[in-house]
Amino acid sequence: MFRLLHTADWHIGKSLAGYDRTGEWEVFFQRLIKTIEEQSPDLMIVAGDVFDSATPSNVSANMYYNLIETLHTKYPTLKIVITSGNHDSQSYLNAPKEILHYFNVDVVGSVARDDDGICFDKMVIDLGGAIVCAVPYLRRGDVMSMGGEKPSVSEFYQRMLEAAVKVRGERQVPIIGVGHLTTIGAIYNKDINSEITATRDDSVGGLENIDPHEFPDDFAYIALGHIHRRQRAGNRENIWYSGSPIPMSFSEKDYSNSLSIMDFDGRQLSEIHTVELPHVVKLRRVPDKLSDFETVANALQQLPDDEEMFIEVALNPDLRSPEIKTRIINELLKGKKAKFCGFQLVGVAGASILGDDAPMSVEQLQTMDPMTVIADIYQARMHTQLSDRHADMLRTIIDEIAET
């Protein structure tokens, strides 16, 4: 038997409304170590978005490297495969790969190439008991550079599989794929500040909306990242998103976070189970729907004093103001460990806050996150999401304006 631990979308370093969440990652890493101790996996795959930023802080980097050192010290036979996601810097992940190899860690931050094009065989990792096709986050150029009449993501995986089959030979071991992408039918939230910030490009075989049935059948399992909710891809029993280990935004507050454990018998997937990861710090919307100030005040006052939590306040948009925000923080939450993270975000494209067709007022828009407004309007007008490049450019501009 060969056992895999599948995880993804750690987003180390991501804050929430400016609040540091280092403690939550520290607890997650402790739980991860405990799970490895109890489950004894042969391999751990991290399917992209290790970091939340292309330029991680020293604190984030230290947590990452300390974890790798601890895992290698405690479990020297554990193999680890790490691929990049759309939030990761390919070069940053790749830089220490030669050193990390001595810790039984294989990092694939970018598509391998030489003068003749893509080197599919260099992204195939032979672990003895399994073969891994370590596909990083694919960009348009990665797929287009394959050539051919209709280059596609499915064709990319087919070529990876062909390279893996050659490496495997006659051995009765599984071939495991890795990916960081969105599949058709995947359930995810559309908060631009949360999980989906990548381009959707159907001109290249659908860089995002991949039909799960287009993945080659001969993969024993495909470990996916990019969607933060744990779920199966389509009705394919052998293709799963592990989900993220902690909720990244309030739109993910009800997600059930977990680690995925996969067992293989010979070349086939034989069993699937999960290890639940209870939320370290709860994310709560108070109250549970948009309300007037009196209802909000009563709900906030009923929160326990000694329980740490992040809260999003569901106050009707026309009642919001800097004065109300100050009153919430200084009066209603005084003496409580609850941290105010802002007002509930609401859509702006085509419908009002309360569900009718009236346009939103300037005052209502001023209470909202600028990035959410831009992303929502763009998707409504263009029927597609902002590309990651444009989203990053806009974030930079917004941050620069905020600092002036």
Q: What are the roles of these predicted feature ranges?
A:
Residues 63-75, 207-218:
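Catalytic-core regions built around general acid/base machinery
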Residues 56, 87-236:
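His/Asp/Glu-rich metal-coordinating catalytic cores
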Residues 1-69, 76-77, 177, 396-404:
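N-terminal active-site segment of His-dependent metallophosphoesterases
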Residues 264-404:
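Accessory, non-catalytic peripheral segments of nucleic-acid enzymes
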Residues 9, 49, 64, 85, ...:
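Divalent metal-coordination and catalytic microenvironments
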Residues 73-79, 173, 237:
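A short helix->loop->beta-strand "cap" motif at the edges of active sites that frequently abuts
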Residues 212-216, 220-285, 289:
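A conserved active-site cap/scaffold subdomain adjacent to cofactor or substrate pockets
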